[in-house]
Amino acid sequence: MKRYLMPLVLTASLALAAPAAAATPTLDKKTIAMMDDITAVFEYSALTPQYGNIENDNDGCGWTAGWIGFCTATGDMLDLVEHYNGVKPGNVLEKYTPTLRKLADAGSDSVKELGTKFPADWKAAAKDSVFTQLQIKIGHEMYLNPALAMAGKIGVKTNLGVENLFDTGLMMGPGAGDCDGMPKIVKETTAAAGGTPATGKDEKAWFKTYNQIRIKHMKKPCTPGREHDWPDAVDRVQALQKLYDDGKQDLRAPLTIAGGWNLTITDPRD
């Protein structure tokens, strides 16, 4: 489920005392699909993205739906639906756009305004390949692209390193202004480690420190309301750390996600 409640900032800018940024990592389609499937495991205990899932977790997000948990309270669901309207006018979700905008502007987690038919209409939209492809595209623009930009900035070379940054941004925020977000954790890790992979620090050791700092943020978050659910989700970080411990930096299938899931991804696909 989506847990990021601060306004979306799609830049991963961060001032670091480092030399010129390394090249942004290039991911092949199978690796990207694997990252999407890891998200499906973490979010829904599923092996592939769950585009039609919609639920109210009473966690401050309002309706949480789609493969990454687009939320009515945060504005990312509004962004998705507006893109869908542009590509496919008259779609089943278009009529909800004004209400989605109102909820996003207010940061409201109310689910009443959208009416009782909204969940069914979301599920209907999820049967449309245009909508599911947009879910992937928008999700990557919001969270994977900032992770790749940050990876290039700090010299991350491995697929698992990018996955760590991607998952943190997706769960805790990709923006420099978020007090628990991915850039904040990168900054604290850089200080604790005395540098980044770009300055010669071992990437595996660097991410071990990164994951320890991320868990500290999850156990005692400064993001309002997250103290109720983030402490229970640290197994997500522990599962990523185990992939490091097992030498799975390339994220090649078959890949077993440990922790409370113990699910093996054998055929990565969106």
For the regions a language model picked out, list residue spans one by one.
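Boundary at the C-terminal end of the N-terminal hydrophobic targeting segment
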Residues: 17-23
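Cell-wall polysaccharide-cleaving catalytic domain and substrate-binding groove, primarily
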Residues: 23-154, 160-270
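Bacterial N-terminal signal peptides that target proteins for export
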Residues: 1-6
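Bacterial N-terminal signal peptides
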Residues: 7-17
